[in-house]
Amino acid sequence: MDLRSARSALLLFPRLFAVYVCLAFVLFSSAQPPLPIPPVLTGTDIQLTLQEGTWEFHPDEVVPTYGYNGDLLGPTIMLDQGQAVTLNVTNTLPDLTTTHWHGMHVSPMNDGGPHSLIYPNTTWSPSFTVLDRASTFWYHPHGHGLTDYQVTMGAAGMIIVRDALEAALVLPRTYAIDDIPLILQTKAIVGGMLSVHTGLDSVVVVNGARQPLAEVPAQVVRLRCLNGSSERTFHLGFENDMPFHVIGTDGGLLAAPLPKTRLRLMPGERVELLVDLSGMQGGTFSMIAFNSELPNGIIGAAEVGNGMATLDGYNDNALNGADFQLLSFSVTAPTSDPITSIPAEFVPVLPYNEADADLTRSFTFTPEGTMPMEMIEGPFEINGALMDMDVFNEVVPLGSTEIWEFTNNTMVGHPIHIHDIQFNILDRSGMPPEDWETGWKDVVYVPSMGSARVITRFDDFADPEMPYMYHCHLLMHEDEGMMGQFLVIDPNAIGETKAGQRTMHVWPQPFSNGRLNLRTALLNGNLNVVLRDAFGRIVHVSTANFTEGSAGIYPSQLAPGLYAVQILSRDGQLHSATFIVQP
């Protein structure tokens, strides 16, 4: 045997071993734990407590964990479109945290991003009206630099939103009976602890149980699948290529069901599937991650890198590039009122028109350093910068329709999540997206050395001080700085601010460079003009010569964001106004 053949055999062995382990697990399915079903929270005033706990992932394998209202994960929150809700999140952890309502269309003050810190032994209580379509969302911590640790420790839960259009369809919706939540994750347990920032995540769990067994009735069953992993992608399917129908993605139902035997689910993504189990009473089957079929460059595939270099320890994880069981199902008797057919149509999906876009923004992913391994390991920058809590990277006008174009100049595929909105995927590396990706999405896969374009509209919420986030949902990448911030600004609310009886007008809006014009009544002569950024820091001071209330200044090198211009007149009156800067 030559050296290349020997190396190939060594690389193949762990993947064959993973398949063997999965098959053995199926043969001894009596040892499988039952699928845990998270309890449900409903109503207009919901209590969540983020707490420490312990969890037994396997006999004699009890580890410290985090959870909402329990030891691991959290309850499923059920909401109705149009209802008002207050979500009271109490933090009993020893650390700072936040809670983000992933995928939901809420104001930036209610979004739960890194600026909405919840200190230990305090409660954060966002209130909002549910505007979203019927879909599957989720919630999880989002503190900058803390997300991967707290999610890995177990802090996450599912959100189900219902609406009148979905309620009118003949679909399974009896929770835990024919409408099953599945939170798919992999964990690494090292030295009796859950390990973070590691490629050793070889423990496969669904709803916190290790490759469990679910009982489902012999009828059409709905599976709400959430990839809650830190990094691993799952190429979903069922044994023997049993068909399923995709009926919904991140932000809502599709226009019609799509028959499939495989579907790629990246971290942060959700998908709703229907499986028709009519006539299968007494049978069993398994959901499989067919990760041997993933293209290289995706974490979970056989290879990440260029064949000469890869992630540290990547080839030591038997799951990488292997097919493995996620969970199995035992088919029981049908319910008294079973769903036995799949509707031919669901709800209209009216995508945004590319011709209506007001602006295209470009985002390029590159490694922070120049070493070859950093093309694989990172940290990764967006447009040449790591996340800075004090920098607003983009300023978006309220009501604008925009194309966001992502270019990935790294050796790793990135799932990119945009807060606030749902978007339509226009193309990926110049090719149309998968047919099941043509609905509403808030996570888009950007392949290694490839690109993706999405289109969306920014409606309803504007805030001149509190940003939304966009970031990679590989949580280690996010924590290391592969994240940016954007403000949504109402242009009609910018430019005039009263100070007592004095007003000032500032233009052009938005400002980029050159002369910034100021006009305010009753000012004459030389006066100091101060510019402050959204955090109150002085970024520019100059003297302007006012003639009959008008003057101009020439600020330079202002980063995109919101600014205040302030002038103290000789009679002690403060004249101020706000303006936005865009590149």
List the predicted regions and their residue ranges.
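C-terminal substrate/ligand-recognition segments
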Residues: 362-425, 442-465, 471
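Surface-exposed, short loops/turns at beta-strand junctions within beta-sandwich domains
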Residues: 132-133, 278-281, 462-464, 523, ...
